[in-house]
Regions:
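N-terminal active-site segment of His-dependent metallophosphoesterases
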Residues: 19-113
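Extended active-site neighborhood of metal-dependent phosphoesterases/phosphodiesterases
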Residues: 30-51, 109-201, 223, 229-238, ...
Length: 297
């Protein structure tokens, strides 16, 4: 009994010392079953591209685990925009939108979300689309990460991070793109069942973007927490023409081939100073993609 009490005290002390707090550690408001009960289709305003207006070949900028507010990480954002500008000057393929795979904030504090707001606005403004797309700011699509909801950060994330919802999808010529809420280490049953119905309802190839990896080198903390859910997802993806599962959370990154689809856990922006370009080609009978990793310096 004393050993159990001692271990509990150590756990409690560690939690109170990590800027999370006892209340947040033992019970967190806005669980996934409340945050994300369905995977909503984006409107034409939220995803401002039509099949006719989209080129067959295009790029997508991907970032993950920026962790604004973590003073340990280098200030990569100061170098990032110069690096991205140089990349775009030497590559002619249009870059249509950006995806951020969660953990934009480190503690979920309001001050961190102010920095997030400024950062995503700069991405949008400095990478405006061509005249064909009315020179609109480049859309930045977010998925929510576990750090984003610390300290009751969910509402701040929802207010700050476009498209202001945590589970959604859109379609391009040959693909369906799904963005899922795994910030609690699980999809939860409502989101899972809605996703399952939507995936089965379409034969198109599909991409999945979310924060938590499926496997992550077998490290429990960095993988989806429920082994049964993970097995269900792998089976579901194999049945419904999923081609890519793209995640963050595990900062060193990883790659796995499940025969039917591939899992890319991309390297983090905050810890490793990396961003990524997803190259898409929808000109053939089947879409083709590859992911290029760019060091900031």
């Amino acid at each position: 009994m004393r050993i159990k009490q001692f271990l509990f005290c150590i756990l409690l002390f560690s939690l109170t010392g990590c800027d999370l707090g006892v209340h947040q550690a033992l019970w967190r408001p806005h669980p996934v079953d409340e945050r994300s009960t369905e995977v909503a289709k984006l409107s034409v305003v939220e995803f401002p591209f039509t099949r006719n207006s989209m080129p067959s070949k295009y790029d997508c900028l991907i970032l993950t685990d920026i962790h604004f507010g973590n003073k340990i990480n280098p200030a990569w954002d100061k170098l990032f925009f110069d690096s991205l500008k140089k990349y775009r000057e030497t590559h002619s393929t249009p870059m249509l939108f950006c995806i951020i795979l969660g953990d934009v904030a480190h503690h979920g504090f309001a001050s961190e979300y102010e920095t997030v707001k400024t950062f995503q606005q700069r991405i949008s403004e400095e990478n405006r689309l061509s005249a064909e797309h009315r020179n609109i700011p480049m859309p930045v699509y977010h998925v929510v990460g576990n750090h984003d909801v610390y300290n009751s950060g969910w509402k701040l994330w929802q207010q700050t991070c476009y498209p202001h919802k945590s589970a959604y999808y859109f379609e391009t010529k040959q693909l369906e793109w799904y963005f899922l809420d795994t910030a609690s280490g699980t999809l939860g049953r409502p989101q899972f069942y809605d996703l399952k119905a939507k995936l089965h309802n379409s034969s198109k190839p599909k991409f999945i973007f979310t924060h938590y990896p499926l496997y992550s080198n077998g490290i429990v903390y960095f993988s989806l927490s429920n082994p049964r859910e993970r097995a269900e997802l792998i089976s579901l993806f194999a049945q419904t023409n999923v081609k890519l599962y793209c995640s963050g959370h595990y900062h060193p990154g990883a790659y796995y081939d499940y025969a039917g689809f591939q899992e890319y856990t991309v390297k983090s922006f905050g810890s490793f100073g990396k961003y990524h370009i997803l190259h898409i080609d929808e000109s053939g009978e089947e879409p083709v993609y590859n992911i290029e990793t760019i060091p900031i310096r």
